UniProtKB/Swiss-Prot annotation:
Top-level taxonomy: Eukaryota, Viridiplantae, Streptophyta, Embryophyta, Tracheophyta
Name of the protein in its database record: Unknown protein from spot 207 of 2D-PAGE of etiolated coleoptile
Additional comment: On the 2D-gel the determined pI of this unknown protein is: 6.2, its MW is: 27.1 kDa.
Homology family: Belongs to the GST superfamily. HSP26 family.
Top-level taxon of the source organism: Eukaryota
């Protein structure tokens, strides 16, 4: 099988990596015209 690492995250405190890797977040920022700090 595939090797993987399971990590639990508190979704109330999203990591910078998660925010950077989330294309929906990027699209929302683009469409809404907000800075990432505001869109959280």
């Amino acid at each position: 099988g595939l090797a993987y690492e399971y990590l639990e995250q508190d979704l109330g405190k999203k990591s910078e990596l998660l925010l950077a890797a989330n294309p929906v977040h990027k699209v929302y920022d683009f469409v809404x015209g907000m800075k990432p700090e505001v869109a959280k």
